[in-house]
């Protein structure tokens, strides 16, 4: 990947201030001068900038497109630009490469991993499949390219129930890697031959039922937007089931579903159980609504590794480029295509 001539850019002084550490690149403020330079460098490189909903506000503001991982991967495939800068975690950039094999895909910091995607390896999945010969493997979109390549059908949080329901009821199903989304699918389908991998997103798992219940009872007129990866999703449904909270105000939603619901809600206050970066998009979508985090400490350190310094470095140096083995990419692409053939995949995570 070409390194831009720094002597021809206003970024020269800013790049000189960048420092690297295990927690990411720092030394640059996401101010107006930085934003203008990022946009100029992206144009010089012929790149489009994509940012996930959980990114820092300044990264979301400078991006050409903001959304969930599936929506952004589709945008990457359709974009006229030959270079994609994916501001998100590594599996998301991999997925963009799977769906856009002929494009250059960059991630501002390749160390931005994902605890959920890392909770199952290809070796784990092969061993699990050996224990259940003939089972259909359904993998959440939040998986590595290598796991997608061993998957029969991918799913998103908004279509996981429909994907599993489409499978022959006599076939065993291996659902990975998120145990909370898997529990939600089992609850909605009533399927007893659904085996669920014990993986989790460390951020969503940390939003517990006790704090959700406490916040809900303290705000009886609020709506609840709960991501299905949350450890508190079952508690949210229990609150509705026992009558402690009106069922119509408890909504289990993907990030895309949350944005749709934000645009139509009549509630004055909404309690949100997901990564706190989502609040920025929700508040922009419906500024008249008071969106509050159920847990304001629910911040993904990997998402926040995509800093202003990292994005500037990425555009100057053309780093870090994402590569996926062509065979793995082809197999992973098939599992995503099968999901799309079943029906509208909706939002990603």
From Swiss-Prot:
EC number: 2.5.1.72
GO cellular component: cytosol
Cofactors that this protein relies on: [4Fe-4S] cluster
Positions annotated to bind [4Fe-4S] cluster: 114, 201, 300
Keywords of the record: 4Fe-4S, Cytoplasm, Iron, Iron-sulfur, Metal-binding, Pyridine nucleotide biosynthesis, Transferase
GO process annotations (BP): 'de novo' NAD biosynthetic process from L-aspartate
Parts forming coiled coils: none
Subcellular location: Cytoplasm
Binding positions for iminosuccinate per the UniProt entry: 52, 69, 140-142, 157, 227-229, 255
A Pfam family this chain is assigned to: NadA
Stored Gene3D superfamilies: NadA-like
Pathway where it operates: Cofactor biosynthesis; NAD(+) biosynthesis; quinolinate from iminoaspartate: step 1/1
Cofactor-binding details, from the entry: Binds 1 [4Fe-4S] cluster per subunit.
InterPro entries, per the entry: NadA, NadA_sf, Quinolinate_synth_type2
GO-annotated molecular function: 4 iron, 4 sulfur cluster binding; metal ion binding; quinolinate synthetase A activity
Reactions accelerated catalytically: iminosuccinate + dihydroxyacetone phosphate = quinolinate + phosphate + 2 H2O + H(+)
Family: Belongs to the quinolinate synthase family. Type 2 subfamily.
PANTHER family: QUINOLINATE SYNTHASE, CHLOROPLASTIC, QUINOLINATE SYNTHETASE A
Role of this protein: Catalyzes the condensation of iminoaspartate with dihydroxyacetone phosphate to form quinolinate.
Protein name according to UniProt: Quinolinate synthase
Protein source organism: Mycolicibacterium paratuberculosis (strain ATCC BAA-968 / K-10) (Mycobacterium paratuberculosis)
Lineage of origin: Bacteria, Bacillati, Actinomycetota, Actinomycetes, Mycobacteriales
